[in-house]
Amino acid sequence: MIAALLPSWAVTEHAFTDAPDDPVSLLFPEEAAHVARAVPKRLHEFATVRVCARAALGRLGLPPGPLLPGRRGAPSWPDGVVGSMTHCQGFRGAAVARAADAASLGIDAEPNGPLPDGVLAMVSLPSEREWLAGLAARRPDVHWDRLLFSAKESVFKAWYPLTGLELDFDEAELAVDPDAGTFTARLLVPGPVVGGRRLDGFEGRWAAGEGLVVTAIAVAAPAGTAEESAEGAGKEATADDRTAVP
């Protein structure tokens, strides 16, 4: 599903179930040490999403290696590579690309079900809640509140590698096209500079199926460069600022 949302230069791998193997056996020692005290659910999702990521990196011709969480939990990718991971109940996925092609990637998958009570007010702007109400009546097959949440997660995942800074839910205003399968995010804070141009937002794509809503953003690398340079403004991130949604 996610592959269809990204350019051809992005490589994706996904899994709908965890491997039957002992999850620790799928990890490099450094990774296993990072989740030594994790509960089984966390251990399985951590291992499986890295199996997906290593498979995607292999398709780029890169050898397997540890993918350790860095500051804010963002994975540390090999030099010359950008990527993004996502996991939710019943899905794990990864997308990678060479830095010559992509400045940043952001992917997210969520169950196609309503957000828990009270969460929408925490993650949305009044303008977003207005169009959500209209879409809920028009297309009840998609839980648009969950799609909004997923899209904002993809926005953050695309934003963070470019800035190293936090982006609150109310600092990007989203609009979704239900027919084209696209969305736009207008940044309400100064955006990162990529290739000498300051971004004022992100464009992404979405899909629903297999009991999921999935979203993806690809920021292309500046033409003729092998890596992006970025700067931005905002608040520093911490590892657990973001709202976790079941």
UniProtKB/Swiss-Prot annotation:
Presence of the UniProt keyword Transferase in the record: yes
Region (Disordered): 223-246
Gene Ontology cellular component annotations, sorted alphabetically: enterobactin synthetase complex; plasma membrane
Matching Pfam families: 4PPT_N, ACPS
GO BP annotations listed: enterobactin biosynthetic process
Domain of life: Bacteria
Catalysed conversion reaction: apo-[ACP] + CoA = holo-[ACP] + adenosine 3',5'-bisphosphate + H(+)
Keywords: Transferase
PANTHER family: ENTEROBACTIN SYNTHASE COMPONENT D (PTHR38096:SF1)
Described purpose of this protein according to its UniProt entry: Transfers the 4'-phosphopantetheine moiety from coenzyme A to a Ser of an acyl-carrier-protein. The enzyme is able to transfer the cofactor to a broad range of enzymes with acyl- or peptidyl-carrier protein domains.
Family: Belongs to the P-Pant transferase superfamily. Gsp/Sfp/HetI/AcpT family.
Name listed for the protein in its UniProt record: 4'-phosphopantetheinyl transferase Svp
